[in-house]
């Protein structure tokens, strides 16, 4: 790659080729090379795209063999890059070329996600002088043998999502709970609408906890648990997002909401069927010790780790 051809938009053919590239890498590595938000951005002009075309061993001579997505600057958060190289076009320096292009564009200020922290990603990071700066753990547990009862929280009632009328409170709590978070914080109606449009969205799997006693304003949202059923992976559910208003923390609300959602996923995915073996997954920041311990108490164990790499501050 002699010059980086950054693009704000991709045409439908290019979007299709990138999705096929991601699918090929996912099948080969048994882990998706980019997050779901990258795929969501393919049809928009909110991020920047970088494509590398070339030959695929035993395949097309002019295929998209490398792709990188770069988020725009946002508040004080570093830009994030995610990239993928076709399994049959690796060991040609494509990944390094994409990464160097991103570093050149951002003045070496961006980060790179390495999903699954696979050996090729670790080797590329080392060759570029990048160091781990953030770890995101994926934890899983079986949906069998769940606790018999969900812990109740006094003065709180939990119901499912009732539609657009819930959105203002949902956004308020989400943005208060994740004010620090580079991906989950700062949501608007756009982010909610995009997720409602996803094939997996089910209002019956979005649980909202409201204050229902004198200590809280009735009707005020205290927390929520958004679950997800992975339609492309039968038997897999996800604790997609659990958010609790900082004013309501310390009451066991997060654990109660998590348990309610997991119980629903177990019913939804047929945990009572002797032939089924459903599983629930979640993501948690590795340095969030309290949350990790909470999930461990709920029976979750570490399944994989995603690592964000960056140029060390002294070298930047």
Swiss-Prot record:
GO molecular function ontology, one term from the record: protein-N-terminal-alanine acetyltransferase activity
Residues noted as binding 1D-myo-inositol 2-(L-cysteinylamino)-2-deoxy-alpha-D-glucopyranoside in the record, renumbered to the chain: 36, 183, 228, 238, 283
Domain called N-acetyltransferase: residue spans: 16-153, 156-316
Function, in words: Catalyzes the transfer of acetyl from acetyl-CoA to desacetylmycothiol (Cys-GlcN-Ins) to form mycothiol.
Subunit annotation: Monomer.
Cross-referenced Gene3D superfamilies: 3.40.630.30
Binding residues for acetyl-CoA 1: 83-85, 91-96
Residues bound to acetyl-CoA 2: 242-244, 249-255, 288-293
PANTHER family per the UniProt record, alphabetical: L-AMINO ACID N-ACETYLTRANSFERASE (PTHR43617), MYCOTHIOL ACETYLTRANSFERASE (PTHR43617:SF31)
This protein's name: Mycothiol acetyltransferase
Chemical reaction(s) catalysed: 1D-myo-inositol 2-(L-cysteinylamino)-2-deoxy-alpha-D-glucopyranoside + acetyl-CoA = mycothiol + CoA + H(+)
E.C. number: 2.3.1.189
